[in-house]
């Protein structure tokens, strides 16, 4: 009996800790508007929009949702989130003018850590890019390294590449979870970046 009580207490503690982590994650809502339309701030808002969509697409997913895939040959929700993590890694590294090693070596294998790290990487990028001038942005490049070989691309590719791709795949997750019987939480408004609770 004592073991059951301890187990119950530990389980409740873990669940409460996960809820606290979730409430502290970035992009539950889009931050207040920037005070100017600096080039960096426009890029930041695009990343914030992607982060908001990802936050709510993945909020409240069950282990059954994470395994869901629309067909035998398709990717599961878990695999899609791993891909989004890789995209967030590219965005973060580019914002710091660092090399993005492909494939990323440190992809978390725990759901809470994978989601948290993805959102934190996007948040890190917004902090780096905020208020950057066009000249400062022009100095940034997407740098990939695979098998010891590097390739570079202009920052423009981050808009139609990783940022847009996160939005696209977040939409897939929303569709998959709805098909699996767990629709997006009510009140999510991607236009305002706020969620009515």
Language-model features: locations:
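Membrane-proximal N-terminal soluble sensing/regulatory segments of transmembrane proteins
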Residues: 38-39
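Bacterial Sec-dependent N-terminal signal peptides
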Residues: 1-22
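Surface-exposed helix-capping loop/turn segments at secondary-structure junctions
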Residues: 60-66, 128-138, 178-184
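Short, contiguous alpha-helical
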Residues: 19-25, 32, 44-48, 55, ...
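Acidic/histidine-rich alpha-helical segments that form the ligand environment
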Residues: 109-146, 151-168
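Residues within well-ordered alpha-helical secondary structure of globular protein domains
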Residues: 60, 83-86, 120
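Solvent-exposed, charged/polar functional surfaces in cytosolic regulatory/catalytic domains
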Residues: 53-56, 60, 124, 128, ...
């Amino acid at each position: 009996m004592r073991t059951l009580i301890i187990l119950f207490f530990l389980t409740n503690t873990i669940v409460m800790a996960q809820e606290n982590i979730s409430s502290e994650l970035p992009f539950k809502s889009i931050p207040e508007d920037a005070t100017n339309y600096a080039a960096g701030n426009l890029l930041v808002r695009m990343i914030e929009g992607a982060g908001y969509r990802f936050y709510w697409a993945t909020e409240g997913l069950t282990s059954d949702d994470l395994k869901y895939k629309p067909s035998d040959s398709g990717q599961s929700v878990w695999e899609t989130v791993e891909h989004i993590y890789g995209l967030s890694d590219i965005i973060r590294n580019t914002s710091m003018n660092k090399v993005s090693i492909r494939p990323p070596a440190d992809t978390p294998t725990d759901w809470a850590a994978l989601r948290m790290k993805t959102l934190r990487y996007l948040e890190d990028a917004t902090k780096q890019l905020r208020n950057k001038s066009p000249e400062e942005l022009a100095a940034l490049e997407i740098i990939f390294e695979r098998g010891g070989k590097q390739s570079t691309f202009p920052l423009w590719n981050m808009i139609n590449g990783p940022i847009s791709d996160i939005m696209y795949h977040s939409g897939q997750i929303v569709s998959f979870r709805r098909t699996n019987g767990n629709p997006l939480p009510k009140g999510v408004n991607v236009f305002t970046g706020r969620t009515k609770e």
